[in-house]
């Protein structure tokens, strides 16, 4: 179930997902495995094209198949569990969205969307952009706000120029989403929205995601207030 609240007729939506999960394979390993699988798939296609010109011995294909299988094992082993309470991923994002909305002037037109099933293929976000009856506008998706680490702006598909202009120069330069990593912003970008994903953390943050260590003993919430203030300030300034 997605939770939706609006003030006025919003042209900007603040988004965060509510669900959490645990997985036995770290997210970094999964991303590397997906990237490696795509690389070896490209190599196999190149070898297939070369075979039209030069015969290839069978062992080449056997070796490629074995390497591709090994590369895909971490992905196949990434079963979903419930050992993570999801303090960082993504109670912190939901808290940031609600706090930013609270800080904005009461007459600000804004939409708030708290999605479900992000951890299950972005199902909640994809259902909402498909069936919610909202024409594509702009969204800020908040996913993972740690107490320490760098603030990051992440995008998929096209560069969200107008969103970056709204945020201003005080924010970091955006980076493309790592292959194999999914965020609700992907569902919005696929549906034609202009969207920026916002995260704060470090490699230590990434190691906690989807593990039993993602709990309140490892998160105080200071980053939530910091990012919410920064978001609300940028949104309010853009409307003056």
Question: How would you label these PLM feature ranges?
Answer:
Residues 17:
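Histidine-centered divalent metal-coordination motifs
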Residues 21-25, 72-76, 148-150, 204-209:
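Short acidic/His/Gly/Ser-rich catalytic and metal-binding motifs that mark active-site loops
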Residues 9-13:
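Active-site beta-strand-loop-beta-strand hairpin of nuclease catalytic cores
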Residues 1-8, 25-54, 58-62:
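A non-catalytic alpha/beta surface segment that caps or lines the substrate-entry region
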Residues 27-35, 85-92, 219-226:
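Short alpha-helix boundary/capping segments
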């Amino acid at each position: 179930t997605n939770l939706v609240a609006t003030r006025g007729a919003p042209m900007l939506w603040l988004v965060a997902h509510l669900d959490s999960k645990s997985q036995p394979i770290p997210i970094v390993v999964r991303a590397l495995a997906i990237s490696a699988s795509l690389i070896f798939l490209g190599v196999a296609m190149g070898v297939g094209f070369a075979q039209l010109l030069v015969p290839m011995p069978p062992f080449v294909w056997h070796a490629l198949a074995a390497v591709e299988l090994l590369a895909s094992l971490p992905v196949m082993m990434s079963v979903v569990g419930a050992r993570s309470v999801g303090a960082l991923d993504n109670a912190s994002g939901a808290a940031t969205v609600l706090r930013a909305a609270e800080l904005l002037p009461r007459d600000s037109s804004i939409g708030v969307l708290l999605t479900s099933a992000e951890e299950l293929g972005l199902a909640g976000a994809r259902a909402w952009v498909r069936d919610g009856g909202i024409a594509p506008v702009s969204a800020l998706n908040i996913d993972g706000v740690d107490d320490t680490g760098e603030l990051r702006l992440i995008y998929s598909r096209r560069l969200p120029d107008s969103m970056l202009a709204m945020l201003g120069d005080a924010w970091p330069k955006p980076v493309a989403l790592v292959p194999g990593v999914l965020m609700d912003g992907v569902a919005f970008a696929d549906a034609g929205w202009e969207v920026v994903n916002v995260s704060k953390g470090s490699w230590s943050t990434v190691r906690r995601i989807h593990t039993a260590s993602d709990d309140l003993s490892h998160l105080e919430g200071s980053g939530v207030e910091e990012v919410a203030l920064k978001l609300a300030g940028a949104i309010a300034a853009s409307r003056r």
